[in-house]
Regions:
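N-terminal amphipathic/basic leader segments beginning at the initiator methionine
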Residues: 2-22
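Short alpha-helical basic/polar micro-motif
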Residues: 221, 388, 392, 561
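Active-site cavity-forming subdomains of large catalytic enzyme subunits
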Residues: 140-143, 147-216, 220-236
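Structural signal for conserved beta-strand scaffold positions within catalytic alpha/beta enzyme cores
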Residues: 19-20, 189, 205-207, 251, ...
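Hydrophobic helix-and-loop "lid/oligomerization" segment in the mid-to-C-terminal part
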Residues: 20-163, 183-184, 232-453, 457, ...
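Acidic, metal-coordinating catalytic cores used for nucleic-acid/nucleotide bond scission
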Residues: 99, 129-131, 166-172, 213, ...
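A short acidic, amphipathic alpha-helical/loop segment
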Residues: 175-180, 375, 390, 493, ...
Length: 595
C-alpha cells in the first residue's frame, strides 16, 4: 500500500482515547509487602492483584498452583473413558481443527495415547472441501483412513474406530454426534467453543461453557487437563507419560488462540515457553530455525513467527502437514516440513495483502459500513482460509465488529467474524442466524456459512443488533496507559523489572507508558512495513519503531507517544515500540493509532 492511500484511509480509523492510571496508598503498601518497586506494585494492582499472596503467585507461576482438573464438568467421565480405551487398547480417532489450537491439541493427545500404547489415528479435515468441525464428509474420510490403518495390522479389521475424540470442535456438531451414536461409535468432545443452540450427546463433553465457570482455557489446555485427570486416576501412567514435557505444545496452542494469559493459562504458557526453548520435538526445532526464534522463546515468537507458519497449511491447503510436523521423530522430515510451511506462510501473506486491499476498496465505496458498528464484506474468489486474518486486520484498524466472507462460484460463502469487548460476535451471529447456514465460535472470534444472496440481509440484521445493543463508547479505541515516564527511564533496569510480569499477551498486556516532550533526532526510515526512528527528549535518546506507519504521517515538532519497551536482540539494546502518538497537549493533530 502506498503512503498516500495509507494516509487517506487513516481518516476512517477510530479515535483513540488515552486512559492514564493513577497510583495510591494501597499500591504503595502492596509494593512494600512484596519488596518490589512502586511501579511494579502499581502494575500488579492494575492487573487486579492487590492481595500480596495472590500477587506473589502471579509473579512466580508454578505448576503446583494449577486448579484441580476435576473441577471441569465432564472431565472425570472423559478421563475414565480414556482409561478404558487404554486398558482395552481400543482404536481411537482424534479429530481436530485446522488452526494452531486444534493442531496442537490433536498432536498432544495423539502423542500421549501413543506413549500409553493406544492405537490411534489422527485426522484434521480440509478447510475447503470438508469445513470446520465434525462433518459427515470429514468423518467418512477419517473412517476410511482408520480402516486402511487397521487393515495393515491384519485383514478383516473393523472399519470404524472404537472411540472418537473431537478436540477444538464438536460442540456445535449435534447431528454428526447423533450419527456416530447411531453407528455405534462412542465419542468424547474436548472443546472451548460456545454451542450454537442445544448441546450434543456424547459419552462426555469437556467444555467450560457447560456450567458457566468462565474458564479461558484453549482446547489444548483442556486436553492437558484431561491428561492430568487421567494421570490422577492412574498414577502408574506417569512412567510413560511425563506431562510437563508436553507443555511446549500447550503453550503453542494457548498463545496461538489468543486466550487470556491469566490463571492456569499463565502457568501453562510460562512453563511451556521454557520447554519450547529446550527444542525437544524435531518439528518445533526445525520450525524455530526457519522462523529465526532465539534460545529463549517469547509469546511474540509464538504469536508472530511459529503460529502463523503452523496456521498457513490449514489456511491454504491441508493442516495435516502441520500436524505431521509436530508428530514426526525424523529430523530430515522435520526440516523439509518446516521449510514447506515457511513457504506457504509467504504465500498466505500475499493472499492476505490482496484481500485486505480489496476489502478496503469495498469500504471506500460504502463508507456507511464504518458508521454502523459492523463491517460485513464478501466477494467471490476470496480465499476462505485467509478471511479470519483479514477480519482481524480490519478489526484492529476500525474497532468494529467485522465479518469477512469468501464466496465460491456457486455462491456458497464461508466467513470469519471478529467481535469487540462488550459485543459478543457469537451473540450477533445468533441474532442473525435466520440468514446463515451455520455458525459457531466464541465471544471475540467465530466462523459461519452464508449464501451470497443472503449477505445483505445478514449485514442488515447484524448492524441492527449492534445499533440496538451497542453504545458509542464501545466503538472508541482505548489505550490503558500505566503512567507517564521520561524518555530517560527507557533503559535495561526498567525493562528487566517489567519482565517479572511476563509472559505477556491477551489479558496480561505488556505495560504501556506515555513518553512526553519528544522530537525526532533523525528522519524516520521505512523498510518492509517497519518505520524506525531515533527519539530525543532533552539529553535522552532512544531508538523507536512502529509497524504499518506511513512516513508521511510522522508528526513534526514536539509530540508524545504511547509505547512499550522492547529488547533488540540483534543490537543488544532497549528500544520503544510505538503504539500511538499525538501532538503535545494543545496541538491540533489527532492521535494516530499504529497497532
Amino acid at each position: 500500500m502506498d503512503e498516500a492511500a495509507m494516509s487517506d484511509r487513516a481518516e476512517w480509523e477510530a479515535e483513540t482515547i488515552w486512559e492514564i492510571g493513577a497510583s495510591g496508598e494501597e499500591v504503595e503498601a502492596l509494593a512494600r509487602d512484596l519488596g518490589v518497586s512502586p511501579l511494579l506494585g502499581e502494575l500488579l494492582a492494575e492487573r487486579g492483584y492487590r492481595d500480596p499472596a495472590e500477587a506473589s503467585r502471579f509473579l512466580q507461576p508454578r505448576l503446583s498452583e494449577l486448579e484441580d482438573p476435576f473441577q471441569l464438568t465432564g472431565l472425570r467421565q472423559a478421563s475414565e473413558r480414556l482409561r478404558e480405551a487404554i486398558a482395552r487398547r481400543q482404536w481411537t480417532l482424534v479429530y481436530g481443527d485446522y488452526d494452531v489450537d486444534g493442531v496442537s491439541s490433536t498432536a498432544l493427545l495423539v502423542r500421549a495415547l501413543r506413549l500409553l500404547g493406544v492405537p490411534v489415528t489422527a485426522f484434521i479435515p480440509e478447510r475447503a472441501s470438508e469445513g470446520y468441525g465434525l462433518t459427515r464428509k470429514g468423518l467418512e474420510r477419517a473412517f476410511r483412513l482408520v480402516h486402511r490403518e487397521r487393515e495393515r495390522l491384519g485383514p478383516g479389521g473393523k472399519g470404524t474406530p472404537d472411540l472418537v475424540v473431537a478436540v477444538d470442535c464438536g460442540t456445535t456438531s449435534v447431528e454428526e454426534l447423533a450419527w456416530l451414536e447411531e453407528e455405534g461409535v462412542e465419542a468424547l468432545v474436548v472443546d472451548h467453543h460456545q454451542p450454537a443452540g442445544r448441546w450434543p450427546r456424547a459419552c462426555a463433553i469437556v467444555n467450560p461453557h457447560q456450567d458457566g465457570r468462565g474458564s479461558h482455557l484453549a482446547s489444548v489446555g483442556l486436553v492437558f487437563k484431561l491428561l492430568h485427570g487421567l494421570l490422577k486416576l492412574e498414577p502408574g501412567y506417569r512412567e510413560r507419560l511425563v506431562l510437563r514435557e508436553e507443555l511446549d505444545l500447550v503453550a503453542l496452542g494457548t498463545i496461538g488462540d489468543v486466550v487470556p494469559l491469566t490463571g492456569d493459562n499463565r502457568i501453562l504458557v510460562a512453563r511451556g515457553l521454557e520447554q519450547l526453548g529446550r527444542r525437544r520435538l524435531p518439528g518445533l526445532r526445525a520450525l524455530a530455525s526457519v522462523s529465526n526464534v532465539g534460545e529463549k522463546p517469547t509469546v511474540d515468537d509464538v504469536a508472530f513467527r511459529l503460529a502463523p507458519r503452523l496456521n498457513a497449511s490449514g489456511r491454504l491447503d491441508d493442516a495435516m502437514e502441520s500436524l505431521h510436523l509436530l508428530l514426526t521423530d525424523s529430523t530430515s522430515e522435520a526440516e523439509e516440513g518446516a521449510l514447506s510451511l515457511h513457504r506457504k506462510n509467504l504465500q498466505r501473506r500475499l493472499v492476505e495483502r490482496q484481500m485486505l486491499e480489496e476489502a478496503l476498496g469495498v469500504l471506500e465505496k460504502e463508507p456507511s459500513a464504518l458508521t454502523s458498528g459492523a463491517i460485513v464484506v464478501g466477494k467471490r474468489g476470496w480465499h476462505a482460509g485467509v478471511a479470519g486474518v483479514v477480519a482481524s486486520r480490519l478489526l484492529k484498524r476500525f474497532h468494529r465488529l467485522v465479518a469477512v466472507v469468501a464466496f465460491d462460484e456457486s455462491g456458497e460463502g464461508k466467513g470469519s467474524a471478529r467481535g469487540i469487548p462488550g459485543m459478543s460476535i457469537v451473540e450477533g451471529l445468533r441474532v442473525a442466524a435466520a440468514h446463515l447456514e451455520k455458525f459457531g465460535g466464541h465471544d471475540l472470534a467465530a466462523g459461519f456459512s452464508v449464501r451470497e444472496e443472503n449477505l445483505p440481509a445478514f449485514r442488515a440484521s447484524l448492524a441492527g443488533w449492534v445499533k440496538r445493543e451497542g453504545s458509542p463508547e464501545l466503538f472508541r479505541k482505548r489505550l490503558k496507559i500505566t503512567r507517564e515516564l521520561p524518555l530517560s527511564a527507557a533503559g535495561l533496569p526498567l525493562y528487566d523489572e517489567l519482565e517479572r510480569l511476563a509472559p505477556f499477551g491477551a489479558g496480561n498486556a505488556r505495560p504501556l507508558f506515555a513518553f512526553p516532550t519528544l522530537s525526532l533526532e533523525r528522519p524516520p526510515v521505512q523498510a518492509r512495513g517497519c518505520t524506525r526512528m531515533l527519539l530525543r527528549s532533552g539529553d535522552a535518546r532512544c531508538e523507536a519503531f512502529a509497524f504499518d506507519l506511513a512516513v508521511s504521517r510522522v508528526i513534526p515538532g514536539r509530540f508524545q507517544i504511547a509505547g512499550h519497551l522492547d529488547w533488540d536482540a540483534l543490537g543488544k539494546r532497549i528500544r520503544v515500540r510505538i503504539v500511538d502518538w499525538r501532538a503535545e497537549p494543545g496541538g491540533c493533530l489527532r492521535s494516530a493509532t499504529i497497532e
